[in-house]
Amino acid sequence: MMLQRTMIVGVVLIMATGGVMGRGRLPAQAGGRGAAPQTTAPAGRGAQPGMNMVPEEIPLWEGGAPGALGSAEADKPTLTIYRASRRSSGTAVVVAPGGAYQNLAMDHEGRQVAAFLNSMGVSAFVLKYRLGPKYHHPIELGDAQRAIRIVRSRAQEFAVQPDRIGMMGFSAGGHLASTAATHFDNGKPGATDAIDRVSSRPDFLILGYPVISTDPAVAHAGSVKNLLGDNPDPKLLEDLSNDLRVTPQTPPTFIFHTNADTAVPAENSVRFYLALRKAKVPAEMHIFENGPHGVGLSLDDPALSVWPTLLTNWLRGRGLLTKPPA
């Protein structure tokens, strides 16, 4: 019998955690949640099979991003492209690392995740989005939407299918991904920029220990403050509780979380899952009994390390790991 307890579609298991602590500041993890953002692979790390050894970084906007408050690297949102170098499935994922909307865990929630996706034949696009407290909503959402539009508008160039573009996010990056999945548009036909004419809706969604709600009972206070500043409008808070924004058009979703997460409690994932279920959106959720916040791929944890396999099975079951016929 597996040691971890898992929540799967149709089964709800919530265990007492003895209270929620430390929601204002995410704990530092070995993967570098508190480290400065990285946009290229760290030196000395070997690539996994199927990973593109020469990632390409591109700006989200040529000539500067709208709403930029300076010209430093933090003012320049980018995508780092890791193309699947073999057995490409034609599927793409935009990856949003976490970091409480203040930092970006570009290694263990960015590059390492890209390597894992490449190993399945999935091309990865790691998003460096703008952060608080300098930038607030809707800047972050605009960066995420732009990333999805870029991949979709250049799908042929990237050797991916325009209807197989997902978004994956961890922690606060999970909030950004779920916001993109619940606040999308179908494109702006009259836009001067051709990229803005295509849809910003992700075709599927992958969430790792995500921030979902702005409800103080379960929210990560630091993420909310960095995203919205002090004293945000109550209507905006409600609008960005993404469990309240789920509709039948929300994309199919895979979620994993840990019951022992005291920074971002699992109720965030539970609320989103139940909203998906109510809207009859295909969804799968796994709640593991143990494990801290910010675990990434969890390669060193015998129990948690099964979640990438569960995700692989979910993607395969949805036909996303098989290259479509020419």
Predicted regions and their residues:
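Catalytic nucleophile-loop/oxyanion-hole region of alpha/beta-hydrolase
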Residues: 105-107, 111-112, 126-162, 298-306
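Short beta-strand/loop motif that positions the catalytic acidic residue
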Residues: 255-257, 261
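Disordered, low-complexity segments in secreted/periplasmic proteins that are enriched in proline
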Residues: 20-51, 326
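Primarily recognizes the serine-hydrolase "nucleophile elbow" in alpha/beta-hydrolase
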Residues: 146-223, 237-238, 242
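N-terminal cap/lid segment of alpha/beta-hydrolase-fold proteins
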Residues: 39-87, 91
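Active-site glycine-rich loops that stabilize anionic/oxyanionic intermediates
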Residues: 97-102, 259
